[in-house]
Each structure stands twice: as structure tokens, then as C-alpha cells.
Curated annotation (Swiss-Prot):
Keyword Phosphoprotein: no
Source organism (scientific name): Rickettsia prowazekii (strain Madrid E)
Signal peptide range in chain numbering: 1-18
Gene name linked to the record: tolB
Alphabetical list of InterPro entries matching this protein: 6-blade_b-propeller_TolB-like (IPR011042), PD40 (IPR011659), Tol-Pal_TolB (IPR014167), TolB_N (IPR007195)
Protein family per UniProt: Belongs to the TolB family.
GO biological process, one term: protein import
CC per GO annotation: periplasmic space
Subcellular location: Periplasm
Primary location: periplasm
Protein name per the record: Tol-Pal system protein TolB
């Protein structure tokens, strides 16, 4: 985030101690009670900004499922700001294990200075602190950054709040219009990136969050891959790939991308060098090979294939060698997505029984020697699909659909859930939403 200047803030004795580190892989955890106090301000306008900053921080921490923000109505101590040492007994009295104090000021250059300190009320120690210099319009991102710092200090994992989501928005009235849309991870600042004049599918971030790629059907049989610069708004055609049905996924270094292309009755995985535009076919034989996704180090690719009759998940080296099957359960597997941490692969699993189909989102260990009984279903529904990961590899976002009823049309929405299968939440969008893709942490 080049428009934000960040400094570590230490006003009191800083300790490396934190509350017992939260490990969300151990299943459901009791949320840590935290008080986000009113931020001091140097003007009435900044007082309003401070109130909004507190709301965003509290909402971020609540959404994570790991923190329980305490209502300000129960606060006893009236003093606010970062320049005083809190009356810790007053905060312990309302069962606040953690306390956030902060302030908002306007600098001579017109930017905002937003500062915070995180306190442990039982040890009576400062855990962390920082200040951010931001243009006024970026106050919300500074609030997300503060929540990220708090999350990281208490969990040991990077936060994921200062991120973006790109997805397909679909109007709920006829004729239905599909557009590529962009929003903050929590649904704020939603905006449309395409005009709805053509069918659009599978938006994907490039290796940075500055560009996206998506498939657009100029005609029913001709799909184009577009690149859109989110800073300038400029758009260009990457390629006219006959037979492509999904946008490419990009290598971690941003130099290559993988995609599936249908030719002569089979669908295969291809890698494209983005500089030379040279295509390299990675899979062979008959069958449908789709949904490729790179490992975080770029050395492996996971994909699904029906070459053995039923769609299953496979891993291969990034040059197409050493193909290994990694799924062995009952049902069909689809849309694999490799965790940024490298430890898990998320997937969609479809089970057919008694003429009915059940869709599931699951995770499994990423490498063959680890598989055993590692597969775990974390949510199910009429139509759940398109799992993608938060940049810290701790939360999965996916789309969920409901069927049409006599008095209501079907709908699609975006949800998040942690990797243990707890804390499922809907991300509110202006219209129906599907095919989400999560950015990395913004610069």
C-alpha cells in the first residue's frame, strides 16, 4: 500500500508475550474478549473517522471468529488515547483480556495519522502498536491494517483483512446480467469492472493485486482472456484461446500461467509464458483435465482429471512430469485450490446418491505421503463451489447456491469459513455473487 506510511509505535514497555497463541487448526476456539476503545481525535471530523475506524477494527476481529469485541456500553474507564497507561483493573472488571487504544490526527500535509496500542490487561503490558499515515480516503485500509496487526500478534499468523475480492456479480432480475466486480474482503467498496454486455467468467488476480484476468465471451463460441489494470482501468486481450472455459491461474512469480483448453474431444492443461506467449502442453492422453492451480513455490500443479473414469485430483510437477493421484474417496472432485501456506488443498466434492447430488467443500493434505485419511469436508449444500484461500491460508471463501422455489428465484452468494469448518459467514453483496478470488495482502 504505497499511499500508507507505517511505523511501529512503542510508548511503554513492549513485551514479546501475548495471550496463549490461538491455534485455529485445533477446532472451535473460545473467542478472546477484546475492548476497542474510542479513538482520540483532534477535530470533530476526525472524531467521526475515529468512530468508523473502531467499527471496522471491531468488525474485522469479530468476523475472524477468534475475538469477541465488548460493547462500549459496558466500558468503565472514560480516559482514551495512546499517551496514558490504562486503568487495567477497570478493563478486567468487564472481562476484557485485550484493550485497543488509539487516536486520529491530521498532519500538516493533510494526511491522517492513525495510531493504536494493543494492551494485555492481565499482564498490564503493551503487546504491540503502530501508526499509519494515510490519505483521508484510505482510513478504512488503515483500520484493516490495525486489525491485521492485532490478529497477527495474538494468533502468530498474518492477518487477512486488508485484502480485496474479485467475483462475478449477477443481477437478480431478468434479463440477468453478469459483471466482474471488486470489493473489500468484508463486502465494502463494491464496484463493477465490466459493463455486462457480454458473458464473463472466472476472474483471477495476477501475482499482485494490481491486475485481474477474466474470460469474456465475445460470441457464444469465442472466449477471450482479458487483462485489466485496476489502477488505470486499462484493459487488453491476453489471448484468443479456442476451447478455453476458465481464466488462467498465475505462477507465484507472475511469469507464467496455467489454463485448460479443449481440443479434438479432450481437454488438457497448458502453461503459457506471459512474456513470449508460448504455450506448453502439460497433460496427455484422453479425458478432461481442468482447474489447474500452482503450489506456493510454483514447483507443483494440482488439477482434476477424469482419465480414470471419475473426476479425481492429481498433482504433477510444473513441467507436467510425475503425475500422482491424491484423491481416493467416493464422488467426483473439482476446482482444487492450493493453500498459500502449501499445507492443504481445498476442493469441491460432488456425491451422487439415490438420484440426488450433494455438493461439498473439503480440504486435504497437499502431498501424497501425508494423505492417508487427511480428507475433511468442512461445509455442504445444494450447490457449494469455487473454494479459494485467504492469503494466510486460514480461511476459505466459496460460493453457495440455492434452488428456485415457486415464490422465489434461485440465488448465489459468497461465504467464508475457517479451515476447521467453523465460523461460516455470508459476505453481503448488492446482487447475486459467485466465483470469488481472494487477493494477497495489499501493498
Amino acid at each position: 500500500m504505497r499511499n500508507i506510511v507505517y511505523f511501529i509505535l512503542t510508548l511503554f514497555s513492549l513485551t514479546s508475550y501475548a495471550l496463549e497463541t490461538i491455534n485455529i487448526e485445533h477446532g472451535r476456539v473460545d473467542p478472546t474478549p477484546i475492548a476497542v476503545n474510542k479513538f482520540n481525535a483532534d477535530s470533530s471530523n476526525n472524531d467521526l473517522v475515529g468512530r468508523d475506524v473502531v467499527k471496522v477494527i471491531s468488525n474485522d476481529l469479530k468476523i475472524s471468529g477468534l475475538f469477541r469485541p465488548i460493547s462500549s456500553a459496558s466500558f468503565i474507564e472514560e480516559q482514551t488515547g495512546i499517551k496514558y497507561k490504562p486503568l487495567f483493573a477497570a478493563w478486567r472488571q468487564i472481562n476484557a483480556s485485550l484493550l485497543v487504544n488509539g487516536e486520529v490526527k491530521t498532519l500538516e500535509n493533510g494526511k491522517l495519522k492513525i495510531s493504536f496500542i494493543l494492551w494485555d490487561t492481565f499482564l498490564e503490558k503493551q503487546l504491540t502498536g503502530a501508526l499509519f499515515e494515510v490519505p483521508t480516503k484510505l482510513w478504512r485500509r488503515a483500520a484493516h491494517k490495525i486489525a491485521d496487526k492485532i490478529y497477527e500478534k495474538i494468533t502468530g499468523d498474518p492477518g487477512y483483512f486488508d485484502t480485496k475480492i474479485v467475483y462475478v456479480s449477477e443481477s437478480t432480475v431478468l434479463p440477468k446480467i453478469k459483471r466482474i466486480a471488486l470489493m473489500d474482503y468484508d463486502g465494502a467498496n463494491n464496484k463493477y469492472l465490466t459493463n455486462g454486455k457480454s458473458l464473463v467468467l472466472t476472474p483471477r488476480f495476477a501475482h499482485s493485486a494490481d491486475k485481474i484476468f477474466y474470460v469474456s465471451y465475445a460470441t457464444k463460441s469465442r472466449a477471450l482472456v482479458y487483462e485489466k489494470d485496476l489502477k488505470t482501468g486499462k484493459e487488453s486481450v491476453v489471448g484468443d484461446f479456442v476451447g478455453i472455459s476458465f481464466a488462467p491461474r498465475f505462477s507465484p512469480d507472475g511469469k507464467k500461467a496455467v489454463m485448460s483448453i479443449a481440443k479434438n474431444g479432450s481437454t488438457h492443461i497448458y502453461e503459457i509464458d506471459l512474456a513470449t506467449k508460448q504455450l506448453n502442453k502439460l497433460t496427455n492422453g484422453f479425458g478432461i483435465n481442468t482447474s489447474p492451480s500452482y503450489s506456493p513455490d510454483g514447483k507443483k500443479i494440482v488439477f482434476n482429471s477424469d482419465k480414470n473414469g471419475v473426476p479425481q485430483l492429481y498433482i504433477m510437477n510444473s513441467d507436467g512430469s510425475d503425475v500422482q493421484r491424491i484423491s481416493f474417496g467416493v464422488g467426483s472432485y473439482a476446482s482444487p485450490s492450493w493453500s498459500p501456506r502449501g499445507d492443504y488443498i481445498a476442493f469441491t466434492k460432488i456425491i451422487r446418491q439415490d438420484g440426488e447430488k450433494t455438493f461439498n467443500i473439503g480440504i486435504m493434505k497437499a502431498y501424497p505421503q501425508d494423505h492417508g485419511n487427511s480428507e475433511r469436508i468442512i461445509t455442504s449444500g445444494y450447490l457449494v463451489d469455487s473454494p479459494c484461500w485467504s492469503p494466510n491460508g486460514r480461511v476459505i471463501m466459496f460460493s453457495k447456491g440455492w434452488p428456485s422455489k415457486a415464490n422465489a428465484p434461485g440465488k448465489n452468494k459468497i461465504f467464508t469459513i475457517d479451515l476447521t469448518g467453523h465460523n461460516e459467514r455470508e459476505i453481503i453483496t448488492p446482487a447475486d455473487a459467485s466465483d470469488p478470488e481472494w487477493s494477497g495482502i495489499l501493498n
